[in-house]
């Protein structure tokens, strides 16, 4: 029953999965994994108190179940019990120091509070170290587009005279691999994975497992453009018909320069996505005093918009320059979404494209994360039925796009120069949390 529940959940049949887990527990009340899976299902359904009870039962049955402590922490944070959530994350890390999700969740608490930059950055970097420490190749292979990015970055670091353990051997081996005729021909095949032999693995791993993060310079004052009247910007957004606007010259020149260098130099781009782009996240190394100060500036200078809402998280996406399509249509579980671009316009081959398409109809409150993010056909059908307008914001260097996070959005087609510094990079900040409705909360 538990195994069937897992399969049904993967197929999106959440209610049927829940029934399977409950049946398994009725047969064996001490079935640890069934209690845990039931808790995860309740959380997806927005029934947080029931999820909390499930995780507490798992811990009662096995106090050393690190994932259960971590998952309980997630629920407690959503319920506003921050100190108890911290204790859960700490317990999970104590049991399993390499539990990446517990470390990232712990870091995110300090990030969202915006009161202790040093601890927030330290905890985030600890999470990145866990990733690098445990880095390994899946089935002795690497995605071709990821290797292409990593060698471009390694060459950039070499050109800037950064000395990183294993970098020369990495460049030599990666060059040989990408130079093979079959890989040259398939360079734009985002799904291709390259099978590696043991010698290649041993040559690539030391560099890939090494941490390296750019230390941004100290900036006094605001990191967002001090010449703008931000209260006017705020009023314009609040009075807009559809809660979508763009803001040019968003960051100060100094902050923009430092964020760009951070994104080019830092080895933080670990999350692979199908459309040939890489993600880096605030709770796992994509963080600096400037990143955090931007959030504070937004809360202070646009107090009606951002003041009431906690920073959720922020991240960066870095795209393959030859990418045709960007991020698939999706919405975010937040109140406000701020997206800004930091690759100079000279690298964009199509000045009318490369930006963001936003649809001005919010996602239904009762949709789950999978509805928001995975089922593209269902989303487009919903948008058509609700006569959604598509607002297409073209790409521009240092342009920010501010919109209601419940709006579905997707990256426009991308055609940037095929070189490392030409890769399109965007930063996204989420404020507030839009929870699935539940009769229990």
Describe each model-derived feature in a short phrase.
Residues 2-10, 33-44, 67-78, 101-108:
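Conserved alpha-helical positions within TPR/SEL1-like repeat arrays
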Residues 112, 117-400, 406-441:
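Fe(II)/2-oxoglutarate oxygenase catalytic core
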């Amino acid at each position: 029953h538990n195994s069937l529940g897992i399969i049904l959940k993967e197929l999106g049949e959440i209610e049927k999965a829940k029934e399977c887990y409950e049946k398994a527990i009725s047969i064996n009340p001490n079935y640890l994994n069934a209690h845990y899976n039931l808790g995860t299902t309740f959380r997806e359904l927005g029934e947080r108190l029931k999820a909390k009870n499930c995780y507490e039962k798992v811990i009662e049955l096995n106090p050393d179940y690190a994932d259960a402590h971590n998952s309980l922490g997630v629920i407690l944070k959503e319920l506003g019990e921050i100190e108890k959530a911290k204790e859960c994350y700490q317990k999970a890390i104590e049991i399993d120091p390499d539990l990446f999700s517990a470390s990232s969740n712990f870091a995110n608490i300090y990030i969202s509070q915006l009161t202790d930059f040093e601890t927030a950055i330290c905890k985030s970097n600890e999470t990145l170290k866990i990733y690098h420490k445990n880095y390994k190749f899946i089935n002795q292979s690497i995605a071709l587009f990821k290797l292409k990015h990593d060698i471009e970055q390694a060459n950039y670091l070499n050109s800037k005279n950064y000395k990183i353990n294993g970098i020369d051997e990495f460049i030599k081996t990666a060059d040989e691999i990408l130079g093979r005729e079959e890989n040259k021909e398939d360079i734009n095949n985002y799904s291709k994975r390259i099978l590696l032999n043991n010698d290649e693995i041993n040559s690539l791993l030391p560099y890939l497992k090494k941490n390296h993060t750019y230390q941004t310079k100290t900036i006094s004052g605001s990191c967002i453009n001090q010449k703008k009247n931000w209260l006017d910007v705020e009023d314009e957004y609040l009075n807009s018909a559809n809660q979508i606007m763009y803001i040019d010259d968003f960051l100060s020149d100094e902050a923009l320069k430092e964020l760009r260098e951070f994104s080019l130099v830092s080895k933080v781009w670990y999350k692979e996505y199908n459309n040939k782009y890489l993600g880096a996240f605030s709770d796992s190394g994509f963080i600096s005093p400037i990143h955090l100060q931007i959030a504070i500036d937004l809360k202070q200078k646009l107090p009606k918009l951002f003041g009431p809402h906690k920073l959720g998280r922020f991240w960066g996406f870095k795209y393959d320059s030859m990418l045709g399509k960007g991020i698939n249509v999706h919405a975010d579980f937040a109140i406000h979404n701020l997206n800004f671009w930091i690759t100079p316009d000279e690298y964009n081959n199509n000045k009318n494209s490369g930006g963001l398409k936003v649809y001005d109809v919010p996602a239904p409150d009762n949709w789950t994360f999978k509805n928001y993010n995975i089922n593209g056909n269902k989303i487009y059908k919903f948008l058509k039925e609700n006569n959604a307008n598509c607002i297409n914001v073209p790409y521009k260097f240092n342009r920010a796009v501010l919109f209601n996070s419940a709006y579905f959005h997707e990256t426009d087609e991308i055609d940037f120069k095929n070189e490392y510094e030409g890769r399109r990079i965007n930063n996204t900040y989420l404020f507030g949390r839009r929870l699935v409705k539940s009769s229990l909360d």
